[in-house]
């Protein structure tokens, strides 16, 4: 159970609770056990109003407490505690973390293999069948779930969470407060090959990938995402970057601080993406280009050249009835003949 007082402390890491001083001692002691939407929440749950579309549900909510803006706080039922904040959705994000399920295992599992030269910090959890290579360093309070592999000479910062089946290649550097979800691969060999005179007969000459992957602090990487090591220079992921599931980041890519990347996006080698960019799902970005700061790419956009001006860019074709699409395709081909 989490008290209102504890919720306030968590929220105020990001923004103030504007009516904190007006809450009674009894209200501050109120305990909650979870989060629900305005319609379904019960007396032991917290809810929030982030979108005015759901305002009609506020008056009849049974939630024990509601995160609300100043504009709408008078519409909260009298028996529900109103926590007034500037951005309810951000407050909801903050408190969701303390309601999340905690790790059930702590310590080092007896089946884990840890090289003698590895340096393991204080209060580190290492799950079953993990493999920790030579000269690896793992920071304090980090958690490795089952079957994680960390190859030689890799460093992981403090307070990391590494889910099952993650593989981190040799010589990589992972910052603090990083979350790597199941099946993530960091530091795989980049896709680098030189053609021979006749690849169909003599094949392709493999280029050894000699760089590393460097990941900053407060980074979140979703399941089954692959980030390849650099060919010569490093692949670099900045601070506060969030990456969804099933994203491919090729060798030598550099991603700026605070950028968000949705699922199924592919970023080809040696491309640089600036700070605070938002990249939608299934975006394709060609190699050896630069994208400036504060660029938004809508879903399925194909980027084939550098973007030097901040703003929103799109290239995907929206769905339409098939007959209409066929007529539009004919006209599009005709435009190419002009």
UniProtKB/Swiss-Prot annotation:
Q: Can you quote a single GO CC term?
A: membrane
Citing just one GO molecular function, the answer is: N-acyltransferase activity
- Record flagged with keyword Acyltransferase: yes
The EC number(s) given in the record are 2.3.1.191
Its recorded reaction(s) are: a UDP-3-O-[(3R)-3-hydroxyacyl]-alpha-D-glucosamine + a (3R)-hydroxyacyl-[ACP] = a UDP-2-N,3-O-bis[(3R)-3-hydroxyacyl]-alpha-D-glucosamine + holo-[ACP] + H(+)
Annotated keywords: Acyltransferase, Lipid A biosynthesis, Lipid biosynthesis, Lipid metabolism, Repeat, Transferase
Q: In which pathway does it act?
A: Bacterial outer membrane biogenesis; LPS lipid A biosynthesis
Report if keyword Repeat is assigned.
yes
Superkingdom of source: Bacteria
Q: Which PROSITE patterns match?
A: HEXAPEP_TRANSFERASES (PS00101)
Q: Short name of one Pfam family for this protein? A: LpxD
EC top class named in words: transferase
Q: What Gene Ontology terms for biological process does this UniProt record contain?
A: lipid A biosynthetic process
InterPro entries found in the cross-reference section: Hexapep, Hexapep_transf_CS, LpxD, Trimer_LpxA-like_sf, UDP_GlcNAc_AcTrfase_non-rep
* Family note: Belongs to the transferase hexapeptide repeat family. LpxD subfamily.
Q: What is the purpose of this protein?
A: Catalyzes the N-acylation of UDP-3-O-acylglucosamine using 3-hydroxyacyl-ACP as the acyl donor. Is involved in the biosynthesis of lipid A, a phosphorylated glycolipid that anchors the lipopolysaccharide to the outer membrane of the cell.
Q: How does it assemble?
A: Homotrimer.
Alphabetical list of PANTHER family matching this protein? UDP-3-O-ACYLGLUCOSAMINE N-ACYLTRANSFERASE, UDP-3-O-ACYLGLUCOSAMINE N-ACYLTRANSFERASE 1, MITOCHONDRIAL-RELATED
Q: Name the chain's protein.
A: UDP-3-O-acylglucosamine N-acyltransferase
Q: Which organism is it from?
A: Psychrobacter cryohalolentis (strain ATCC BAA-1226 / DSM 17306 / VKM B-2378 / K5)
